[in-house]
Amino acid sequence: MKTKGKSGVMDMTQGNMAMLILSFALPLMLGNVFQQFYTVADTAIVGKILGVDALAALGTVESINWLVLGTIQGITQGFGILVSQQFGAKKEEALQETIFHASFLAVVAAILFTVGILIGLPGLVGILQVPVDIRPICLDYLYVLFGGIPLMMLYNFTAAMLRAFGDSKTPLTACVIAALFNIALDLYFILELGWGVKGAALATVIAQTLASAYCLWKLCRIEVLTEKRKAAKWRLHAGLCGKLIYLGLPMAFQNL
């Protein structure tokens, strides 16, 4: 199975297993840390510049953010299980077909999550018993942040696919770049433009966009994914969709 250029793909079925696992696991762990950094940066900067009420608002809704992010991460990681198995077995046609189905399910999930969460946000804030005086701040932040759920899904999906090909360094690089942009945009939107918590949320969405674009670009360089197949290979099959959901849902619940 070939790759295009320096795609970062690593065949983990050959070579020193201990070194392969270590070189794969370290960027994975660091990547998870940096992905959480978005909210940490928002909270620190908002608390320092906008004051106690804004800080309290972001701290209060943190559990909702982790709920959404954990669910998305779990689903996409579950999809990556089947992709990694087929990559290791060198089943190229099955690999393409699986990624096609996983992409379809990720798009559907992103749409459902975005619509459902944006509609249900006032109710969620109420369930959390957020103090009435900071609810508007909470909703201002969450509406902008969760309007970017499709981008959150895109990053986690492309990152999961890259990891399934043995490339855990690209998602880490994307996270580091995005985290730095997030800090810079936080300061610009809040200090210079005066956009408050909406600016902090928008900075996170833009940073996610950059991370998503970089991972997608790297994923598209993998040769096996650019080879053309017969049109029949791009038809949806309920069995394969069911298998991906079967792998994704338990991972999502485990992350809650």
Please report, for each region that a protein language model flagged, where it lies by residue:
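Residue-level recognition of specific faces of alpha-helices
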Residues: 20, 36, 43, 57-63, ...
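Helix-loop interface residues and adjacent transmembrane-helix termini in multi-pass membrane transporters
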Residues: 40, 49-52, 86-89, 164-165, ...
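Small-residue-rich hydrophobic transmembrane alpha-helices
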Residues: 55-115, 152-171
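Alpha-helical transmembrane segments of multi-pass membrane transporters/permeases
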Residues: 106, 161-184, 202-205
